Curated annotation (Swiss-Prot):
The keyword Zinc does not apply. It comes from Cupriavidus pinatubonensis (strain JMP 134 / LMG 1197). CDD domains: ALDH_F18-19_ProA-GPR. This is Gamma-glutamyl phosphate reductase. Catalyzes the NADPH-dependent reduction of L-glutamate 5-phosphate into L-glutamate 5-semialdehyde and phosphate. The product spontaneously undergoes cyclization to form 1-pyrroline-5-carboxylate. The lineage of its organism: Bacteria, Pseudomonadati, Pseudomonadota, Betaproteobacteria, Burkholderiales. One of its GO terms (cellular component) is cytoplasm. HAMAP family: ProA. Keywords: Amino-acid biosynthesis, Cytoplasm, NADP, Oxidoreductase, Proline biosynthesis. It is an enzyme of class 1 (oxidoreductase). Its main location: cytoplasm. It comes from the Bacteria. It is found in: Cytoplasm. InterPro entries: Ald_DH/histidinol_DH, Ald_DH_C, Ald_DH_N, Aldehyde_DH_dom, G-glutamylP_reductase_CS, Glu-5-SA_DH, GPR_dom.
Length: 426
């Protein structure tokens, strides 16, 4: 595809999405739910066909030398197909945020002012090897009254196209425009460059992918983005922590899963409790094969307790998202140093304190500048499902618009509505 052809193709996709977004904005809840349930039924009906198509993507990935983890993300197993269908049904069961009016108040002039929740419009979603994102993203955008342009990874092009056909079938069956969900059908990377600059058609970009993808989009995008670059999450064990809670929470925050962006990467411990808190916790970490990168004070304390195999932490370790069985540990003087460290080195994603001191906990959640701040809870809870959002399209550590897990409400905005009885301004 030449550059001219690609630009013409992307412009056509953009125009169709913009037109469809107007129809979606006025679509009834019943029609949107009907579409979601029809798509779920179609996925179950065509499960064998989807697996056959997906097998071709998987075969190409293996032939191209992709590793087992990549192939696993790409594969549409029976479980993955079942989860996609169930996810659609769960989103259909969620309350529809569109049209909700809130904050109504009467003004002295006689007018009544409120805010109505409305769709964002056209959402561009860029993602990599997971074909299930095609359905997750389409479902959330559909339920929130948006149109979406989906640009998945080239490695999943056949799977994504097959899933998009089922989405179009569901939309049409409910009387909604099939163009409300479009998958970019070219694997040309220039399509991403055009998508992120189509300000005339696209209202927001949501990237779902690795750090290199996000960094590129941050440099090149002209369309606003909902994104997070890193998940450098902390837990601070305060001097007034309950040790059982500290061990349980910190073990879970690091070792339940290593790859998610809400996994703890740095553990901070008050010097007043380090000698009691760290040995039992670090014993668990070492038994699970976690490499411990420690500050000098932590090394001295742990070696005195009989630990070996420790690695010195360097300045860059405090800024790393390992996504691996590696944990940086720093002993700090107390709350002030912990807050300062998190705000300096963290990624404003999710941070937690373990403490039984109410005032300390409240100061921590006030002063730590992150999208999610917790008391006596694992950072792994930073998730749309766990927050009761039903589902999420991603997590944002930006400060404008959506912050934290982005569910249906995060794909909407508020407009002011005014009710009057012929009032005029004097």
């Amino acid at each position: 595809m030449t550059e001219l052809d690609l630009n013409q193709y992307m412009d056509r996709v953009g125009r169709q999405a913009r037109a469809a977004s107007r129809a979606m904005a006025r679509a009834s809840t019943a029609d949107k739910n009907r579409a979601l349930l029809t798509i779920a039924a179609a996925i179950r009906r065509d499960a064998d066909k989807l697996k056959a198509v997906n097998a071709r993507d998987v075969e190409r990935a293996r032939a191209n030398g992709q590793d087992a983890a990549f192939v696993d993300r790409l594969t549409l197993s029976d479980k993955a197909i079942k989860t996609m269908a169930e996810g659609l049904e769960q989103i259909a069961a969620l309350a529809d945020p569109i049209g909700e009016i809130s904050n109504m108040k009467f003004r002295p002039t006689g007018i009544q002012v409120g805010q109505m929740r409305v769709p964002l419009g056209v959402i561009g979603i860029i993602y990599e090897s997971r074909p299930n994102v095609t359905i997750d993203a389409a479902a959330l955008c559909l339920k929130s009254g948006n149109a979406t342009i989906l640009r998945g990874g080239s490695e999943a092009i056949e799977s994504n196209t097959a899933l998009a056909a089922l989405v179009a079938e569901g939309l049409a069956s409910a009387g909604l425009p099939p163009e409300a969900v479009q998958v970019v059908e070219t694997t040309d990377r220039a399509a991403v460059g055009r998508l992120i600059t189509m300000t005339e058609y696209v209202d927001v970009i949501v990237p779902r992918g690795g750090k290199s993808l996000i960094a590129r989009l941050m440099e090149e995008a002209r369309v606003p983005m909902i994104k997070h670059l890193d998940g450098i999450c902390h837990v601070f064990i305060d001097a007034d922590a309950d040790l059982d809670k500290a061990v349980r929470v910190c073990d879970n925050a690091k070792t339940q899963r290593y790859a998610p962006c809400n996994t703890m990467e740095t553990l901070l411990v008050s010097q007043d409790i380090a000698a009691r808190a760290l040995p039992p916790l670090c014993r668990i970490y070492q038994e699970k094969g976690v490499e411990l990168r420690v500050c000098p004070a932590t090394r001295a304390m742990l070696e005195a307790a009989g630990f070996s195999g420790l690695v010195d932490a360097h300045e860059e370790d405090w800024r790393l998202e390992y996504l691996a069985p590696i944990l940086a540990i720093k002993t700090v003087a107390g709350l002030d140093e912990a807050i300062a460290h998190i705000n300096e080195y963290g990624s404003h994603h999710t941070d937690s304190i373990i403490t039984e001191n109410y005032s300390t906990g409240m100061r921590f959640i006030r002063e730590v500048d992150s999208a999610s701040v917790m008391i006596n809870a694992s950072t792994r809870f930073a998730d749309g499902f766990e927050y009761g959002l039903g589902a999420e399209i991603g997590i944002s550590n930006d400060k404008l618009h959506a912050r934290g897990p982005v569910g249906l409400e995060g794909l909407t905005s508020l407009k002011y509505v005014v009710f009057g009885h012929g009032e005029i301004r004097t």
